[in-house]
């Protein structure tokens, strides 16, 4: 028979302190700590243009190895029909998402090393933007050098830890429609993160995150389909002539690649297959000039071949290294190596030897989440032919590729933007593919407003309730819903609506938290009251027994029934940001990022790496 052990009255104060302290402390730390991330004055901000609220800093994900992910959050300019958040991650692996923030979809771009200007094509018009340097050690993120991430599952688990803590800090966003976007090797990251979110939601449906879509630009998704596309793309662009001696050399390299894949299937990358692109760049060099592998319309010095692109890198690296910028973004001094666009050490450690390629996750993801794959037509390294090939072979939601009925394929619908041919759209069974003409590996860098129009269409943005002048964007000549706006016509009213909705969301989150804390207080108070009554009655019974010990009258018995309460339930587990401690030694250059021995800079990365200075 089990008995409930009840503490003595003098221990109730201590029990209350121990039980409520972590809960109330976490709630207070969450609300107070959010202010610590507020970016009060980013150096070089333009005097004109919207005033955009920002938060930035580190969140610890692996305390045992001092692993922290750096984030930079920009609040949306307007709320259309609902609140949305786009999470952006760049590729590499090991390349910083500040590329996306400062050169692609963020609200500001660099005019020079000192000054910013407003990006009129920012994806933040109708969505909050959350940029994350992922995995640990990338960009401003940090970790001990012996604890770099090696596998995609490990990366996704750490990202979930980050999101749990981030939403605890900023609960006003945890009911947003969430979209995850990125490019290049993010074609591996994003499906794994999405799967981890969906798995989490199934385990805790009452606190599910509202994942509404994935966007992958020029992604490295399916090696078996994308390696051969190097040669196909070189033929299409006239870089390599079919049947030429150079073509024969490349075909021989491709056969070797295919033998390795056949003998060891299901890997994310193959060193032997990397040689195909490297050989194309070497065979087509003209003196010290070579093709820019991120934009074949351009050239670069050999062996960089695109690593000096885009030109904004000339300003970005020194800007993010400035002390006033580092301080404004709350970057810890423990990031001793400073900001670097791509980390060879992170990329070299991320072997993913036990991870299957993300293409194998897409069929199940497409059952639950819409996916948009978009390709810049002039990118070589993750070119559109490889993406189109993987789609044609992919089986999902009862069909194969874009075949809608036997022998009938979903049409490629012409897309025009402000009177110019922009590309085409193709979609079926929850998958959308967009080819964007006149654009590179980094589509939003080249065509920010078109890329935002693509985003708004995919998210189903409805601007009818805020006014403004929509762009002239048409699919097959039909304008359809007005999705993109250059600026709200009634900015005061729009800003007021935005602010009120933010307040409402924050209030709801606060009410929910307060209700949880009050519930715990009520439970503890009830237990205390019950214990008090039990003690008083027991004292009364003892008094009766002593006073009437010769009187054989009846005696009263008491049975305390109690159901133990979980005072530290997961419902209250919203832990504050752990303190940063420990430094991160400087990282070494990885063998996967070969260098010119006469030049200390990284010169060549694998097919999925982002450009580096």
Curated annotation (Swiss-Prot):
The keyword Signal applies. It is found in: Golgi apparatus, trans-Golgi network membrane. One of its GO terms (biological process) is apoptotic process. It catalyses: Preferential release of a C-terminal arginine or lysine residue. Glycans are attached at residues 120, 430, 438, 490. Residues 471-481 have a biased composition (Basic and acidic residues). It is a single-pass type I membrane protein. Keywords: Apoptosis, Carboxypeptidase, Glycoprotein, Golgi apparatus, Hydrolase, Membrane, Protease, Signal, Transmembrane, Transmembrane helix. Residues 466-499, 569-597 are annotated as: Disordered. The active site is at residues 184, 379, 441. Residues 535-613 are cytoplasmic. Residues 486-497 have a biased composition (Polar residues). Residues 28-513 are lumenal. SUPFAM superfamilies: alpha/beta-Hydrolases (SSF53474). Its EC number is 3.4.16.6. PROSITE patterns: CARBOXYPEPT_SER_HIS, CARBOXYPEPT_SER_SER. Residues 1-27 form the signal peptide. The chain crosses the membrane at residues 514-534. GO terms for cellular component: membrane; trans-Golgi network. GO terms for molecular function: serine-type carboxypeptidase activity. Protease with a carboxypeptidase B-like function involved in the C-terminal processing of the lysine and arginine residues from protein precursors. Promotes cell fusion and is involved in the programmed cell death. Belongs to the peptidase S10 family. This is Pheromone-processing carboxypeptidase KEX1.
């Amino acid at each position: 028979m089990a008995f409930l052990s009840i503490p003595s009255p003098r221990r109730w104060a201590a029990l209350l302190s121990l039980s409520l302290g972590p809960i109330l402390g976490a709630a207070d730390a969450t609300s107070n700590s959010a202010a610590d991330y507020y970016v009060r004055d980013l150096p070089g901000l333009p005097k004109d243009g919207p005033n955009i609220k920002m938060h930035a800093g580190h969140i610890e994900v692996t305390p045992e190895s001092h692993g922290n992910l750096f984030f930079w959050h920009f609040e949306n300019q307007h709320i259309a029909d609902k609140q949305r958040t786009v999470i952006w991650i760049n590729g590499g692996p090991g390349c910083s998402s500040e590329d996306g923030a400062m050169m692609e979809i963020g609200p500001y771009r660099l005019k020079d090393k000192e000054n910013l200007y407003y990006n009129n094509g920012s994806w933040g018009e109708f969505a909050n933007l959350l940029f994350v340097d992922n995995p640990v050690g990338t960009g401003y993120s940090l970790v001990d050098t012996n604890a770099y991430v090696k596998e995609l599952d490990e990366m996704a688990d750490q990202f979930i830890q980050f999101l749990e803590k981030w939403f605890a800090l900023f609960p006003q966003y945890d009911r947003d429609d969430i979209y995850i976007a990125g490019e290049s090797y993010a074609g591996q990251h994003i499906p794994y993160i999405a799967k981890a979110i969906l798995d989490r939601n199934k385990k805790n449906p009452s606190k599910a995150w509202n994942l509404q879509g994935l966007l992958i630009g020029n992604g490295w998704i399916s090696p078996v389909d994308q390696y051969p596309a190097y040669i196909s793309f070189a033929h299409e662009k006239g870089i390599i002539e079919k049947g030429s001696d150079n073509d024969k050399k490349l075909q021989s390299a491709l056969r070797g690649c295919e033998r390795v894949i056949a003998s060891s299937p299901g890997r994310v990358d193959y060193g032997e297959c990397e040689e195909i692109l490297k050989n194309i760049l070497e065979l087509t060099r003209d003196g010290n000039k070579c093709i820019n592998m991120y934009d074949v319309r351009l050239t670069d010095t050999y062996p960089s071949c695109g690593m000096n692109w885009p030109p904004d890198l000339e300003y970005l690296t020194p800007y993010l290294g400035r002390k006033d910028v580092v301080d404004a973004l709350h970057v810890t001094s423990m990031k001793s190596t400073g900001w670097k666009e791509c980390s060879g050490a992170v990329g070299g450690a991320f072997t993913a030897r036990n991870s299957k390629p993300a293409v194998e996750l897409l069929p199940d993801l497409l059952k639950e989440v819409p996916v948009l794959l978009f390709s810049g037509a002039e990118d070589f390294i993750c070119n559109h032919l490889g993406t189109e090939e993987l789609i044609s072979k992919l089986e999902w939601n009862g069909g194969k590729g874009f075949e809608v009925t036997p022998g009938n394929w979903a049409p490629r619908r012409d897309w025009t933007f402000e009177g110019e041919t922009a590309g085409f759209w193709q979609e079926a069974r929850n998958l959308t593919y967009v080819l964007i003409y006149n654009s590179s590996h980094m589509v939003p860098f080249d065509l920010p407003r078109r890329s935002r129009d693509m985003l708004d269409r995919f998210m189903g943005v409805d601007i009818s309730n805020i006014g403004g002048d929509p762009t002239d964007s048409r699919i097959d000549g039909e304008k359809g819903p007005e999705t993109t706006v250059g600026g709200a016509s009634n900015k005061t009213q729009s800003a007021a609506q935005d602010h009120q909705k933010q307040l409402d969301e924050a209030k709801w989150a606060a009410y929910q938290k307060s209700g949880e804390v009050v519930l715990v207080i009520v439970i503890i108070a009830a237990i205390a009251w019950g214990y008090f009554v039990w003690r008083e009655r027991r004292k009364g019974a003892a008094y009766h027994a002593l006073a009437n010990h010769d009187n054989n009258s009846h005696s009263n018995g008491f049975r305390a029934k109690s159901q133990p309460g979980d005072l530290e339930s997961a419902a209250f587990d919203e832990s504050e940001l752990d303190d940063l401690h420990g430094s991160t030694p400087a990282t070494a250059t990885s063998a996967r990022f070969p260098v010119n021995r006469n030049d200390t800079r990284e010169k060549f990365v694998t097919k999925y790496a982002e450009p580096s200075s």
